[in-house]
Amino acid sequence: MAFPRLFSPLRIGPLEARNRIVFGAHFTMFSEPARTWGEPGFHGERLGRYVEDRARGGAGVIIVGQTQVHPTTAYQMTNNAAAWDEAAVPHFRRVTEPIHRHGALAFIQLAHNGGVNFGAWSKLPVWAPSAVVNSTEAPKVLERHEIKELVEYFARSAKNAAAGGFDGIEIHAAHGYLIHEFLSPRSNQRSDEYGGNLANRMRFAVEVLTAVRAAVGPTVAVGLRLVGDEEQKYGPGLTADDAAAIAARFAALGLVDFLNVSVGISGIGMVRPVYAPHLLGVYAAHAVKQAAQNVPVFAVHRILLPDEAEGILERGEADAVTLVRALIADPEWPNKARDGVPHTIRRCTGNNQGCYGNLTQNLPITCVTNPAVGRDAELGLGTLTPAAISKRLIVVGGGPAGLEAAWVAAARGHRVTLFERGDRLGGKIRLAQMLPGRSELSDFADWRIGECERRGVEIRLNTEATANSVLALSPDAVIVATGGRATKFGTSKFFPMPVAGSEQDFVIDHEQALIRADSLGARVIIFDAVGHIEAIGLGELLAARGTEVTVVTTLPMPINLDRETMGYALPRAVQAGMRWRPNTALGAIGDHAVTLVDTLSRQFEQIADIDTVVIRTNGLPNDELYFELKDRMPKVMRVGDAVAVRYADRAIFDGHMAGRQV
């Protein structure tokens, strides 16, 4: 076996997992909403199908999350799931039965989000141990009778979960949520028996664990999602050593069957983007493991490859690995590793756009690289069935949309030829991966190229497809994936375009700037009318090379980036020397000069001696071939940026659906 430690069984209290791969708890917003939108609902069929694919894909433990234990914590997301109501029990079975059907253990994460909550819809006060603000509103300090009530609700929720078929309970004591707040001296400033020294700060957690164990009995595993390090740079906070001390006490009390160790606090470091190193939380898991030798410890955070997971276990840093985004991207990650074909794993790139990015907009999660996420019943494992008739298909364009369409159609038995006018496949992914810290995005293209090769797609590089050359091959269907083009004259929701003077030769679009980064001159102005990564990334790239570069935008921040990505990308660029000018408009472009307008003060500023002005605005589709073909063939589809210039997740989804529709 390729990864013997990873695929060895693991004892977790009264249970045995078939391997050491844990699909970790996370928000999905796949719960079935209540009759009144905004009220908490229950887990159901959509979540059941989603977790079933991860069980079918080979994970040993599936931790369903996050599930709320009390009305005061049920409104952090629009579509939360409740556990305290006995009505949840049959809904739980709709999740546990599919997991068990494929031989995995079904765990559930029970949580009270404490001070991270807010009462915008519920109007309920935020409950926290102390008057320490941990979200957008100040909390109510918990009274003793309310603490007792919460202990009872945790136990009631656990009892319901066990009745619904869950094999294990994970109590959330991390990410800045309520039990974590009690554990930390940063957020627990109480002077009663629940505050002060470590034993007192642990008291609430001990009471919860004791009550939960009594509620579920000896056949159900009980453990913690434990804070491993708060990563507080500017004040007191729990460190890995503190986490080890806490873990040792829990282990000595015999209250935990496992410890799932993560670092950071909700909203500032929980879902690390592509810029973050792999294995970034392993040090904390290792510290906990050394302190709690007899308790299985799970490591988490950016563990993406089977080699990395096996190494953690081999070095004794943890007993199991918790994967979330890696299994969102590819549910079959475990089976592919077990079967000795890890090179076929569709990797998580840390893009964050569809998973964490959607959650921050109160939308169900998706995945840039896996179009099936959230649509698992329709597009998940086992749904890509052979076509009734094998057809001759031409795909024009070798970007992510075209590659996705090609491999999906070939997997269904069609005979596929892909034309790419350039000498390399990947399309605009190849530009995106040139931005600093974003090289891992290459897997969007590389995995699809591999699938095309494995499925027998004929690839013709350096071939410009025309309507006549396509028709000469007598295809049954054509998918036009010719992409889009950047332009300095595009439109923007945030600023009237084009900018006066942008027709001049020293004014270029952002793609030209990236290709010609070495020859833009000493002083560059970048105007960002979109609010995504391109302007910031290009600014960092140029600043690191010694260019005096200023990024100007009318926006207060890059609003189309999730806050985790923005929290890395913007500081990186500024620290490299990029000047950042938000709330600033590009008024006009003169002869190697620009006029800037502060949108708040309305003050003007003239800047001269500019070598290059770069404009990042919305692009235009390359749709000419589609319109030449659409009336000359019965089956012509266009996908991705050839429809409208959007993001990679839309392009890949378009390509996937087109490949299924041939």
Spans of model-derived segments:
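Flavin-dependent oxidoreductase catalytic cores
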Residues: M1-V396, P400, E404-A411, R415-V416, ...
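Rossmann-like dinucleotide/flavin-binding elements
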Residues: S390-F419, L461-S474, A481-P498, E503-L561, ...
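Short, surface-exposed connector motifs at secondary-structure boundaries
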Residues: Q290-P296, R315-A320, E453, L520-R523, ...
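Short gly/pro/ser/thr-enriched loop/turn and capping motifs at secondary-structure boundaries
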Residues: G267, L327-D330, R424-G426, T487, ...
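Flanking helices and flexible, charged tails adjoining ferredoxin-like Fe-S electron-transfer domains
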Residues: L209, E378-A388, A411, R415, ...
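Rossmann-like dinucleotide-binding cores of NAD(P)H-dependent redox enzymes
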Residues: R415-R455, V530-T584, V643
